Design a protein with these regions (language model features):
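Short Pro-Cys-Gly-centered "Cys-loop" motif that presents a nucleophilic cysteine in a tight turn
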Residues: 2-69, 82-320
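Short beta-strand->loop micro-motif that forms the acidic, two-metal-ion catalytic signature
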Residues: 74-81
Length: 320
């Protein structure tokens, strides 16, 4: 279902659904589970690195970033692209972040994140997810609004010309110097980005921040909402809308099932489809089909399915 706002404030409801194939572009909500990463971000340096890595991974994955936000325990991203490009983004981000905390802390306990990739196939879901992502860090009684939150993109949309970016002024409102990535010595740039992956040389960096203006497609995001009024309606998100997004996330994370029970179901489906319970005898296409059936019938997590059908986790993520 989609919502449009006509003259005189009339609300027009339309049903729209997107079909996202493996080779077709679509919208995806990527998010991590804060309960599994309570030590994700513990200092300002962590926030800077986690923030910058969104841009680094966007530049190298092919995924287009429309909105994102960071909290101390988790990350939310709205991306546009093929499923494959979003899987690349996910893998790059998780790997780069794990390397950073391994170097900076010496221990990765409670800090490693696992991003779920949730297809957004209905327009109502898209409208809700886009704003859910940028308002979550400012909820729960926090004394800040989305357009003032430094570690998200809430300040970027439907702004008047000439407005000052959050990341290019200091607390007194004075403009800070910006520098092109290509003008920064390679070692210094690697330290800022916490990555050796390359980014376009003309991208701007200010006060250790890789500016989101370089890679967040603001125009695309604004086209989703069409008007500032529509954006404002969804920004003032109701509790029921939030709960719907949260239920989608919980549902997509899959059922936590004991391995022995999950293996039993895997063998049963394999026997029905291919006449054998030995997954090792199946080819890649058959294992992929088995993975899809396990997801459809039992809604197991991608990680558990990968271990059952003996496929790489990244491969399973592409097709379920």
């Amino acid at each position: 279902m989609s919502v449009a706002y006509g003259r005189g404030g009339r609300t027009i409801i339309m049903m729209t659904q997107y079909s996202i194939g493996a080779d077709r572009s679509g919208y995806f909500h990527l998010c991590s589970d804060g309960a599994l990463s309570p030590q994700f971000l513990i200092c300002e340096d962590d926030f800077c690195v986690a923030f910058n890595l969104v841009g680094v991974c966007a530049a190298n994955s092919g995924a287009t970033i429309l909105s994102f936000s960071l909290e101390d325990t988790h990350l939310h991203v709205l991306a546009y692209g093929t499923k494959e490009s979003c899987v690349r983004f996910k893998t790059m981000y998780e790997t780069s972040w794990a390397h950073h905390i391994g170097r900076s802390r010496g221990s990765r306990q409670g800090a490693v994140i696992d991003l779920e990739i949730i297809p957004v196939e209905e327009r109502e879901h898209l409208l809700s997810a886009g704003t859910y992502i940028i308002i979550q860090p400012t909820k729960d009684g926090k004394q800040i609004m989305p357009y003032d939150y430094l570690w998200g993109t809430g300040s970027m949309y439907f702004r008047s010309q000439g407005h000052r970016s959050l990341w290019t002024v200091d607390s007194a409102g004075n403009r800070l110097d910006m520098v092109k990535a290509g003008d920064i010595p390679e070692k210094r740039l690697c330290d800022i980005l916490a990555s050796r992956r390359t980014i376009p040389g003309e991208w701007l960096i200010c006060n250790r921040i890789l500016l989101p203006d370089n890679y967040v497609d603001v125009a695309h995001f604004e086209r989703i909402y069409q008007t500032a009024n529509c954006f404002r309606v969804f920004l003032a998100s109701s509790r029921s809308r939030d709960q719907e997004i949260q239920q989608r996330i919980a549902s997509y994370r899959g059922v936590a099932m004991e391995d022995t029970e999950a293996r039993k179901h895997c063998h049963e489906i394999s026997k029905q489809l291919f006449g054998t319970t030995n997954v090792r005898l199946l080819d890649t296409i058959q294992r992929t089909q088995l993975a899809q059936e396990l997801r459809s019938k039992w809604h197991l997590s991608a990680r558990q399915i990968a271990s059952l059908v003996l496929l790489k986790y990244s491969e399973v993520c592409k097709y379920i």
